[in-house]
């Protein structure tokens, strides 16, 4: 029987209706120099100057954004399937003007603890938690802990068509439990419709090492701001409040496979939507002016 290689099966759920796409691979050869298998990502995005507003009298203008991501997971095999053990770090830095009623930094440092298993030749399952600290700074970590988790699966209709189903749970979210669905469809030898959130896209494979794509990236996460954030910004309801940050990026890019273990990605596009939502305090700043962005990343499996 052909063995499914779960390390290539990527299924992450980060926000409402945001379910990442699975990939499928043949059985890989053993690595004689590094006995463990795994995956990694190093990514940097710059978003140009944009605007948000709460109402016509309250707005934040002309601020840029840096989004930095590091991700490293090892995938040792055990009898039930493949463990996923690792860590992630993401930092969103905003070039806000002095006195802005928004945090200038949002960051998450979390573990990745999960299991990939295969119920049958056609059904693949992932359970994964991301326990860690999600906040606007590391001043007080004791009550900034959160542990969102996902349960998802893929049904393989054929080598060219897969259905992705799952549910995300995050107690800090406005709607704690959210389901999602998506498909991956290889429409032609060089064309793939990867209609699975958070990165739905249409791909064109130029050759084995080069892929062009156009699509979107939908990001959402929940953070705790500082204990005195509300006092400093004139609204005590925002002290240690939960902030849901959302943004949508649309663009086009290129995946260039430099080696079997390294893929370089470059992407440019436009950010049409961004929102800072203190939903429990009923304070929301939404997009009032989009911005261009550019992304570069190195990623791979080993």
Locations of the language-model features?
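Transmembrane beta-barrel domains of bacterial outer-membrane proteins
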Residues: 26-122, 130-139, 146, 242-244, ...
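Transmembrane beta-strands of outer-membrane beta-barrel pores
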Residues: 44-50, 78, 87-95, 131-137, ...
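Outer-membrane beta-barrel translocator/channel fold
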Residues: 50-52, 59, 92-98, 198-272, ...
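Solvent-exposed loop/turn segments connecting transmembrane beta-strands
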Residues: 59-63, 103-105, 137-143, 168-177, ...
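Hydrophobic, lipid-facing positions within transmembrane beta-strands of outer-membrane proteins
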Residues: 64-72, 107-113, 129-133, 147-151, ...
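Outer-membrane beta-barrel strand-turn architecture
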Residues: 74-78, 117-123, 155-159, 171, ...
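Repeated loop/turn-to-beta-strand initiation elements of outer-membrane beta-barrel proteins
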Residues: 78-84, 121-127, 160-165, 190-193, ...
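Outer-membrane beta-barrel "beta-signal"
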Residues: 181-184, 190, 254-260, 286-302
